[in-house]
């Protein structure tokens, strides 16, 4: 069971990297100017000079020749860059319809990826699965319609359900009294992560049902 949970954690990390690449590329292609990977790498190199503290401990950029070589660490560092000291701020997230929701989604994906990357046991893998479920909900709030279609969000929700099941995260991670009813996976994820927000998380299937109803009602 632990091996299965750790395999799921590896898949969560991989999926978060793929999501991160997609978000960065979409944002990059919405801005004015060149949309090439080389232009992005030049931008990062310039920002490393302007803000060495923020861009500290970055993956090595040498030899990067395709978007597929970028990981969550690099992608989210660019997307979440406050750019306070940038000579030419891009404000990639600020150019979206819902900048706050986009920023929350990027943070959620980064958090889930980091948890999955460092998972060494079933409990940590379960936490990564819970955080991935929350990240999918945040992606729905920030990116539904563009660049993520309803069908794609549905696929992410199904992946989230699969990860939760394989990691045993549909029961509370902390032990509970026998008579207590196990909370929903996403709800226990809020408790574990110390979040206070109410009413925005439910099971992955409930969220997807809501998404489908919203889409068909347009």
Give the predicted meaning of each segment.
Residues 208-216:
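Conserved small/polar residues in nucleotide/adenosyl-binding loops
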Residues 184-203:
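Short Lys/Arg-rich cationic patches that frequently serve as NLS/NoLS or arginine-rich RNA/DNA-binding motifs
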């Amino acid at each position: 069971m632990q091996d299965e949970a750790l395999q799921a954690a590896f898949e969560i990390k991989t999926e978060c990297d793929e999501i991160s690449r997609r978000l960065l590329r979409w944002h990059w292609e919405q801005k004015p100017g060149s949309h090439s990977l080389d232009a992005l790498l030049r931008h990062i190199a310039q920002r490393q000079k302007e803000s060495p503290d923020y861009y500290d401990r970055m993956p090595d950029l040498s030899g990067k020749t395709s978007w597929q070589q970028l990981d969550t660490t690099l992608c989210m560092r660019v997307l979440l860059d406050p750019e306070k000291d940038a000579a030419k701020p891009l404000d990639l997230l600020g150019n979206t319809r819902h900048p706050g929701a986009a920023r929350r989604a990027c943070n959620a994906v980064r958090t889930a990826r980091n948890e999955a990357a460092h998972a060494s046991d079933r409990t940590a893998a379960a936490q990564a699965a819970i955080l991935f479920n929350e990240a999918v909900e945040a992606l729905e709030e920030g990116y539904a319609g563009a660049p993520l279609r309803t069908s794609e969000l549905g696929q992410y929700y199904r992946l989230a359900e699969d990860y939760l099941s394989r990691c045993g995260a549909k029961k509370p991670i902390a032990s509970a009294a026998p008579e207590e009813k196990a909370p929903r996976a996403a709800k226990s994820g809020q408790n574990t992560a110390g979040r206070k927000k109410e009413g925005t998380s439910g099971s992955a299937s409930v969220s997807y049902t809501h998404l489908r109803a919203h889409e068909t009602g347009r």
